[in-house]
Amino acid sequence: MQLTPINSAEAIFEAFFDETLSGLPQWTVHGGGAEGLQVAQRWAWVQYEWQRAPADPATPALRMSRTLDLNCGDYETLMFSLMAPPGARVALVAGTEAGERRMLSTPFAHQKRELLLPLGGARRITALTLEIYVDSRQMVGVVGWLNWIGLQHGGQLERYLRQVARFDERWEDYLQPESFEPAFEPAYGLHLTGAELAEARAAVAKGGGPKASPLWEQAEDARRLVPEKMTTEYVNFWNDTRFSRERDTGKHLLTHGANAAQASVLFRDKTLGRLAARYAMCLAHSTRWDPSFLSWLPGCKWEHRAFVPSLVMYDCALILDLCGEWFTDYGRQLILRRLAEEGQGTNNYNTWWWEYLFWCNQTAWFMPGRMYAYLVLEKTMPARWDPYPKPAASRVAPYTDLALADLYDNLAKILLPDGGYTEGPMYFTFTARQAMITCYYYARARGKVSRELIPPAIRATAQMAEVLASTADDLQMILICDAQYIPQEGAAFLAWLMPDSHWVTVFRKSVARTGGQPMTLLAQNLLREVPAKGPEFRPLVEMPKIGQLASHRKLGGEWVKLFLMGNQSGASHTHEDKGSFVLEFAGDAFARDFGSCDYSNPLADVLKHCQRHNMLVPIAAGVRPRPANPIFADLTPQARGDEMRFHATMELKAGWEGWFTRWTRMWDSRTPAELTITDDWALEQGEGVTFYWTTTLPITLDAKNRRAVIQGRRGRATLTWGEGIEAVVEQLPLEEPIWKKVMQERKEQYLVATLHGETQPRLALTQRGRSGQLAVRVKLELL
């Protein structure tokens, strides 16, 4: 690609994030580095991974280079944006007409960086080399990525950044002064009416007052920040750093304004009301509603869909609705214009361009911002009509109705008849939240009943709630696929819609995590119609279309839950986990699924691996055996069971072409206290198989006696196996503590999430050969 400016001080010449413009084919990846090294183009970066670092730390795990002929005379510094493993040091070497320029970075921490290599007056770059050095004792199973390479002029950058940092809190032409006295009444009544607000205030008073509400803590987070100091040309995708600039890390404009707006009208706090309006003005003054230049690079069609625009639209519409009295007419109309142009323009383009949006979560994902903005525009457009008569019907309304039709089309495609959903419980509860809040707003605007607008297919997900509702004390649901947490408002809507389902169980556990009060005004409003507890679990609950099931039995008054993971052909956002299982007992997850983590953390890719699940995996030197993902085959457990017994089998070789020629997994349990898992297997290639069992609980291994004990708080599990099995307990690296601080930037996630530890305990049982049977017997007992 050509050297392309991204602002007045910087330009890029290597767009690794664009699959067409990426220059990866011009790079040479040198051998002699890490074991199992792979470098491949992905949808938003070039990804590298390896299985084991070089034994000699002076040998780069990854070395790649290319030649080029680039005029750099207008710039002073080379920039390289990449993600490297924690502790890694990265060397950049540039060949120029004035000699070689070289730098070695300081050790990487937890986030991606933009490395700067001074060019020392050079005017032409002729070659580039990247080298990544790591400590072989720490770096096993590594994933990282390369984003882009560019040039920078330091003096011009300072001038450019001064231009961006021009805002203060006065907003004289746009907002009412601090002396203004608000009425704390909604402008449009779409989110809540004045009467509903009064009921919410009474509920807060009954629950201990404002400081007892989790919304108070979220509002205090908003109050601690200065939105004007976080305003740039772009808007970060929450605290996600995958696509933003390093200098914009921590500039978290989204969500805080919406939280401040809700807290303002709930607690009658005028400073929070004006603060919410300031957040909205900062969003309105951001040049582009995207995390960085990636979506707006001249000559490049890569874009990150409508994720950030839809979030900005929602925040701005909510703030206009709840705190609209704080805006001047001019300030309000500025936001309305951005909603119509930047917001709806991007959403409509995405809807027309990308058909896949209707076959996954994303049409619904974008919908609350799209719908709320349309409804606010309905109430305010036309902004000018004199000297002509104002239209009797809104010209916006047909577009609003089209948006609702898009939502219904999307839900009809993604909700399965057995109540399943392929992308896991976090994606589903967020999708359900987006869908139901969209129907909620539309119903209020049209004078309809919200429940009557919600598609019947959503009600079938009561089955999913029962299959995935966790009996572990620290979990609301079993976090399969890319799940990190269960969005509370989504659980609230589902419990409100299906008060006789286990969505009530999930929502009530979520509210308990937030001190007995929900985090948002809507959830507080819905809670009044949700029962105090959910129903009892049924002994066997199956979802044959998606290939998942759960067995529920009791041992001494404590639940024993066994969940089996299958597959619907082509299912997306899933992991390499078909045939995996989760075992819960006495309030703990003895065999666990660790779900996912922040997508800015390469660990999110590692957690998809079959080696991180309760799986049987082939072993082979120098490679990581893995199944296809997605797998284009239905994998469904065949099961029978009651309050006492359970038996299931799965045929699992599909997706493992080139590895397994036979893999049948059986679960047999004559009583809730005992379980035998038997794998009957044969390989096309490899040295044998390893049975992985992973949990957060401590594992004590007695290899001599072929036994491992997993200790819970109220129960224990004893695992035994036959002769000829090699056993080892490992502590796999998991999430560094710094990521807890990152998550705290989004309290709506942090307050209900089950946090990862620094390590993932894993029992590995290896059986050598090309075929065999591996049986693991489990005995459960109460302490």
Language model segments and positions:
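Short, conserved beta-strand segments of beta-strand-rich sandwich/propeller modules, principally
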Residues: 77, 127-129, 676
